[in-house]
Structure formats: structure tokens, C-alpha cells
Amino acid sequence: MLLRCIQAENRKLRRSVIWILFLAVPAISAVYGTFNYNMNLGILKNGWYDLWTQYTLFYALFFFAPLIGVYASYLWRLEHLGHNWNLIMTAPVHPFCLFLAKYCVVAKMALLTQGWMLLLFLLGGRFGAGLEGFPPPEIITWLLRGAVGSLAIIALQLLLSLVIRSFALPILLALGGSIVGLLAASKNIGLLWPYALMILGMNSNKTEDVMAGSLIGFFISCLAFTAGFLLLANLILAKRDVKT
């Protein structure tokens, strides 16, 4: 049943305008990052690592979480129209199964977004910044860690879009959460704030790995926040009734 729900959610993305944002938002970060790198060659001497700091300056700190918010709001949009919630609550599928399906689809989109960012980073470094060779393997590790950190954000954004009918408000909350996440990460308390997990995982705006020696705590925090938000979503859906 979960597989069928996932297939239904995937169909919502066909020919969707969401793909324009999928392509454009990381591309904007890439163009800005490459430009900023070239404008500061006098002080940026670490090649691919310094280019990474410029790419993640806006992508990880401000763009990624709102983009996840767009994915989540878009997948809940149909359910919030008219009396579609009544159809869901009376369907032979547990509503939480629908939530999990949306979670899987947004997680897939987040992973694809990270892959697109990696391709942009490679192309921008080779042809835009004139760097030789290929990015160091740590970059791929940081991208994958960022994807893991995004799992808690995905669960939270889907939860917000579940309880908030507005399309834009959860996205604005994601932006605000990212700003607070930046402050939390700078104060070394990022593991206590879900929006900071992706920033920490991506090693955003850093050349040295800030998570060295803290990976266990990072993964525990990701798991705890994700499980907590999923549990809360299940409780909310279990108490939701048909609206007249």
C-alpha cells in the first residue's frame, strides 16, 4: 500500500513547475558562488575547498530548507483543496501511510537536489573558476551528510504543511528556521535545532570539517528529530476526523 501511495505522490511531480525551482535555486547559488570566488582570489587560496565555502554560503544557510518547504507544501496542496481531506479520512488507506509516502518522495527530491548541486559544483569549479582536477572526496561526504541532515527538516516541513493550509507560510517558517539554525550552529548548539543539522552536515561555509569527532551526536540528533516529527504527525492524523 505504501508503494502505491508513493507512486501516486510521484505522479503529482510530472510536468510540475516544481522542477523549475529544483533547477533554478541551486543554480543561483552556483552562479553566485563562482562569481564570489573569482572576485576574492587574492584571499581564497585553497581551491576546491574555498569554492565550497562560497557555494554553500547561501545554498545551505538560506535556500535549501525553504526549497524543502516548497516540495512539502506542493505535495500537500491537493489535500487542502475543497473536501479532499474527507476523502482521505474515509479511504481504505491509513492517513499516516500517505504521510510516509510524501516523506519518501520529498527525501528523493532532496537527494536529487544534492546530486544536482554536486554537478553544478564540478562544472563551476572546472569551467567557471578554472580549478584543475576534481573536487576532493570530502565534498561528496558533506553532500551526503547534508542529505541525512535534511531528513529531520523534511519531516518537520511535511508536518507544518499538514497542519497549515497556507502554501507559503511553511516556506517562510523554513527560512526563519534556517536563520535560527545559522545562529545555533555558530554557537555550537546546532545539534539541538533541526534546521541546523543540514548546515552542519554540509560543512557549510567551512574548509575544515566542523563535524570531526561529533558524527555520532549528529546522527543521533537527526534520528531523534525525524522520529519525533513522524510520531507527532501520526498522532495528529490519528485524531483528525472528517470535516463537514
List the predicted regions and their residue ranges:
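Pore- or pathway-lining transmembrane helices of multi-pass membrane proteins that form conduits
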Residues: 21-26, 164-182
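Helix-loop-helix units of permease transmembrane domains in multi-pass membrane transporters
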Residues: 74-107
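Transmembrane helix-loop junction
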Residues: 78, 91, 122-126, 162, ...
